[in-house]
């Protein structure tokens, strides 16, 4: 069997231009142009995905097999290329019969070339063979190109259907989850799953609910954007230059403070200069000059001068803590049902929006009688988010098991710098000392943070004492009415 890649190589056909033309034509569709004007961030995310599409289309074309008739015709064409003039004319009728049997598009043109050449009445030369093979090559190239177009048209229909589904999903969720180009790109990658409109409509409903609770959205923003600096002490004390200002005698002092012996010619007393003019005392003058015993004025004065010393220095610097992933634990007990359940799910949706924008991971754990896991930023994150939002809160409260699972997750690779967020009303039994010890160990040794989102003012203070920060959002009727009144 002859592959299309081999045929392209032998006929010097480049499929890159055909693929480029197909993609440009597909994206130029009027409905897509209108959509991209409305959501430019999704268009930029799609543009980053185009090289992968082109590579996939190229691989599919290479994997395609040439039809047997076209392959047999091409093999015959290669044989004719290797034949000399005598062999070519001897096998010409067999070649025409083969083209007729294969129903080749070149058959009629080949028959016309043979009839026009009037071979019985003209001498046999190489010009006819060259012309015949050139026209045959053009016909084979056209057939291969048509095959490319047919395959690309099939791929175009499939790609267009997939594109419309993903654009519909991304367009519906873009106002909800996309905050910047990073979020739009990750949302586009997550839209590969096969979801119907009814599947992701629940996401839109909770997004609308979140818009109706601006205080809850603001609380999620404060928690998600919060960070603190780490004090990091260097292990080795390295020698570094240390600059100090010291007071030293001036090079050109100006204040006279007395008389002393020296060799300073400029500050000599007049009697000493007189001895230099007496011939008998001249040698005595030079002797005293060498011995620095000439009487001269004493001048004094101080200046401040910078001196550099080398000393061992140990730094303790404040580094901004990197924003790691979220591990969100949601209480699914009966007391968290109703409005509390809506707020908890909407809060997780707000954290997902922040995680997408900051290129972080968002991991959800539901704790009741058993722990259920969802990673909302995975490749199948939208499908998992739909399943999470469809979960009902009717279990018990097992906060100890949740914290234990959270600590275990935070010790795994890729989760060392994670932030733990516990969403609950914290109406539960006291925590075992072993769990409290594990949480404090993570806080002290790894500087990992544990946040509590309290949905009730009646949570037990003894339980919430272990958290680094407590974010309160009371869902009681009085608090709800007060928040609505303030708006």
Swiss-Prot record:
CDD domains named in the record: VWA_YIEM_type
Keyword Oxidoreductase: no
Keyword Chaperone: yes
Keywords (A to Z) from UniProt: Chaperone, Cytoplasm
Main location: cytoplasm
Subcellular location: Cytoplasm
Superkingdom field: Bacteria
UniProt GO cellular component terms: cytosol
Cystine pairings recorded for this chain: none
Pfam families the record matches: VWA_CoxE
Entries under PANTHER family matching the protein: PROTEIN VIAA
Oligomeric and partner information: Homodimer. Interacts with RavA.
Family affiliation: Belongs to the ViaA family.
Task performed by this protein: Component of the RavA-ViaA chaperone complex, which may act on the membrane to optimize the function of some of the respiratory chains. ViaA stimulates the ATPase activity of RavA.
Protein name listed in UniProt: Regulatory protein ViaA
Lineage, top ranks: Bacteria, Pseudomonadati, Pseudomonadota, Gammaproteobacteria, Enterobacterales
Gene symbol of the encoding locus: viaA
